[in-house]
Amino acid sequence: LKKFKIINTVYGDATGGRWQAVLDIANTLKSYGHEIVLLRGEENAHLNSGEWPIHVIPNTGFYSIAAALKVRKFIQEKQPDLIIAHSGKAVWLFKNAMLGMQKKIPVLAVNHSHNVKRTLRADAFLHITPYVQELVQALQSNEEKKKPQRVISNLTYLPKVEASPKPLKQPVNIVMLTRMVPNKGVHVLIDALALLKQRGIPFSAVLAGQGEMLEQCKAQASQLGLDDLVSFPGWIGGDDKINLIQQADIIALPSITEIQGIGILDAFAWGKTLITTDDIGIRQTAKHQVNAWCAKADDAISLADGIEYLISHPDEALKYAQQGKNEALEKYCFEQIAKEHNDFIFTIVN
């Protein structure tokens, strides 16, 4: 099979799941022997690309001619077969850079957001959920809908250690791993945990992550009398993260809004019972009473009721974890998504 040279790029702040997805698609396509060249702007200098070397071309705005000329030179130097653009900014920059060029390289937009209008100039589309595809197609003409497009989820890496679903322990240990920012719903979870305490339901909880709301969340937990029950270790990685997840009975992802939520896929991969919300982005992957419990988003009472339900129905809690684990193996693991990525790029380049 032919091997392609691919520029994989993101512009605009890529903190969170988007940056992970940039590296993931680099890894999936590299696993099929393609040559991947990573490119970013200076706004993502704080993000680590691991062992991947990365090129940097600053972009000062959507219509920066200087940036477009530098990118044009970069395209001429690298001679790629395909450009994968992970943001509207990246799509515009590369389409502008190729204006008037004899040989046009196809641009594949990867849509990680519900704000899709800037990506419509792309030649092909990878939507991370069916809902993202609906949003794009609602803005496309009938002609544009014929461009290659496919729904391919984000991926999860299956643990290298034993991670099969197990019955909940008593008292349950609830774990959340997230950025401490408003849309992640950490403050809602803390209110829900206070309700569980009021109801006399025993538990312990670890809310791990950094972010602008960390101090506020700690203060909230203290005010609600949760100091003995809830800990805030900050950012956790490596073996500490593995140990934390292994000790979890319930993984909580209480996001108020989410595009997909890689945390959902990770909970599935680890075989953990998941409590999350009914936000439209989350419902693309988490199905209520099938592979997760989906409480009302931004509703502490609904979240507390859900956790209480799982604790009092351990057989169901285990069943959801088993279904999530099956989906991780069949749909969301690296090998499955890598195959889909590879198949799709052949439909674009040929």
Residue spans of the language-model regions?
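Short His-centered aromatic/hydrophobic patch
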Residues: 85-91, 111
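Conserved acidic donor-binding segment of nucleotide-sugar-dependent glycosyltransferases
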Residues: 288-289, 293-300, 309-314
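A conserved mid-protein helix/loop that constitutes part of the nucleotide-sugar donor-binding site
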Residues: 16-24, 172-200, 205, 212-218, ...
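Short hydrophobic beta-strand element within catalytic cores of glycosyltransferases
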Residues: 273-276
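Acidic anion/phosphate-binding donor-loop and adjacent secondary structure
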Residues: 66, 153-171
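N-terminal strand-loop element at the rim of the active site
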Residues: 8-66, 149
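Donor nucleotide-sugar binding/catalytic pocket of nucleotide-sugar-dependent glycosyltransferases
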Residues: 123-161
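Aromatic "clamp/platform" in nucleotide-sugar-dependent glycosyltransferases that forms part
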Residues: 256
